[in-house]
Amino acid sequence: MQDDPRYRVEVEVSPRFLAHQSTPDEGRYAFAYSIRIQNAGAVPARLVARHWQITDGNGRTEQVDGEGVVGEQPWLRPGEAFHYTSGVLLETEQGQMQGHYDMVADDGTEFIAPIAAFVLSVPRTLH
């Protein structure tokens, strides 16, 4: 059902570095990411699960799977959006995340909402 326009969810991500929660000397780099999930289809749908692939700057990859997001399984009418913020710790100054959400439409159709890869990076300071 991925190509059926009735079942379409758009995902926008805004990552940021959390300097105050990071300890670079210990290899701990904290990042937050704010996500906007919008039902761009024609059928109400519920986000039931998340699947993330997190890769650090050394190429180490971790898979994270779970029910819903931030303790919720949001139900979205057509045009409706859900926002949340979460975070991740890396051992390197940069990395990336990508993944998808498992969705179930009110008519029972299961489909995937892809999350394009986005970069997590410590901003550089110019001197």
Curated annotation (Swiss-Prot):
Q: Which Pfam families match?
A: DUF525
Q: Which residue spans adopt a coiled-coil conformation according to this UniProt entry?
A: none
What range does the record give for the signal peptide? none
UniProt-listed GO biological process terms: error-free translesion synthesis
Q: Where is the ApaG domain?
A: 3-127
InterPro entries linked: ApaG_domain, ApaG_sf, Uncharacterised_ApaG
What name is this protein filed under?
Answer: Protein ApaG
Classification from the root reads: Bacteria, Pseudomonadati, Pseudomonadota, Gammaproteobacteria, Lysobacterales
Q: Which gene encodes it?
A: apaG
